[in-house]
Amino acid sequence: MNSMFRFWIPKTSISMQLRMLSTQTRQALEQAVKEDPIVLFMKGTPTRPMCGFSLKAIQILSLENVASDKLVTYNVLSNDELREGIKEFSDWPTIPQLYINGEFVGGSDILASMHKSGELHKILKEINALAPEQPKDSEEETTKKD
Amino acid sequence: MIRRFFHTMGRQDRIYKTLSEALKTDKITLYNDSYKHSHHIAMKGVPDTNETHFRLEIVSPEFSGMSRVARHRLVYGLLKDEFDGGLHALQITSSKTPDEVS
């Protein structure tokens, strides 16, 4: 995944370099946010978040019962171009940032509000991103088999 | 003169002043949470960890008709210089219009 964000930058004027970096970064990010239904740019990883706000974002998605195969995370601490590029891309100065079906949803504060209001659950359900709930009779079936 | 005075203000005061003027409100509560974050690895190498993390509650008529994302973006945009200058995080736990509060 990280290789997506490594480029060869030709030596040109600074403004040209910035423009080219920005264009390539933008294209990589546009692709990244569309490849999967739910994309979270965070500090650290889901199992080792490196800041409280990224932890909160992961906890909210976990509480919402998001299916693990629907969510992809990018660790911005592993790549400075990614860390700065995503802020420009979204016009949002902080990490974490959540995208659903390619659309920017918000940072940890907005996720918290949407989780509390039920709005986030509604969106995730509509796009079939929730893990299937275990049917109640499955335990009974198991018992019968025994 | 004014510029020099402005830059002697601490970050918390600058944030308050910027937002109160631009958003036409004095209903701003700003908490400094920096001490909670100073040990984070992401803060390694940051020279001044005393004014990096703030938490904001704000009421402004300028938010009328705006989505939550748009409201936060407006606030973040007004504080771009602070983010460029070392502000790491601004939690916005409440951004409402006067009508929404009453």
Swiss-Prot record, chain A:
Domain Glutaredoxin: 26-131
Gene3D superfamilies, sorted: Glutaredoxin
Pfam families, A to Z: Glutaredoxin
Binding residues annotated for glutathione, in chain numbering: 43, 83-87, 95, 108-109
Major site of localization recorded for this protein: mitochondrion
Single biological process term from Gene Ontology: [2Fe-2S] cluster assembly
Keyword Zinc assigned: no
Subcellular location: Mitochondrion
Residue numbers binding [2Fe-2S] cluster: 51
Induction: By nitrosative and osmotic stresses.
Source organism superkingdom: Eukaryota
The keyword Transmembrane helix is assigned to this record: no
A GO CC annotation given for this chain: mitochondrial matrix
GO molecular function, one term: 2 iron, 2 sulfur cluster binding
Signal peptide: none
Keywords for this protein: 2Fe-2S, Iron, Iron-sulfur, Metal-binding, Mitochondrion, Redox-active center
Consequence of substituting residue 51 to S: Abolishes iron-sulfur cluster binding
Subunit composition and interactions: Homodimer. Interacts with ISA1 and ISA2.
Function field: Monothiol glutaredoxin involved in mitochondrial iron-sulfur (Fe/S) cluster transfer. Receives 2Fe/2S clusters from scaffold protein isu1 and mediates their transfer to apoproteins, to the 4Fe/FS cluster biosynthesis machinery, or export from mitochondrion.
Family: Belongs to the glutaredoxin family. Monothiol subfamily.
Protein name listed in UniProt: Monothiol glutaredoxin-5, mitochondrial
Organism expressing this protein natively: Schizosaccharomyces pombe (strain 972 / ATCC 24843)
Name of encoding gene: grx5
Swiss-Prot record, chain B:
Subcellular location: Mitochondrion matrix; Cytoplasm; Nucleus
Keyword Protease (UniProt): no
Phenotype upon loss of function: Leads to delayed spore germination and the unidirectional cell extension is not followed by cell division. Proliferates faster with smaller cell size than the wild-type cell during vegetative growth, but no other significant cellular anomaly, such as defects in septation or cytokinesis are detected. Sensitive to UV light. Shows a normal cell cycle delay after UV irradiation, but displays aberrant septum formation and defects in cytokinesis when released from the UV damage checkpoint. However, chromosome segregation is not affected.
Gene3D superfamilies associated with the record: BolA-like
Taxonomic superkingdom: Eukaryota
Primary location class: mitochondrion
An example Gene Ontology CC term for this record: mitochondrial matrix
Keywords of the record: Cell cycle, Cell division, Cytoplasm, Mitochondrion, Nucleus
Family (UniProt): Belongs to the BolA/IbaG family.
Name of this chain's protein: UV-induced protein uvi31
Taxonomic lineage: Eukaryota, Fungi, Dikarya, Ascomycota, Taphrinomycotina
Gene name in the database record: uvi31
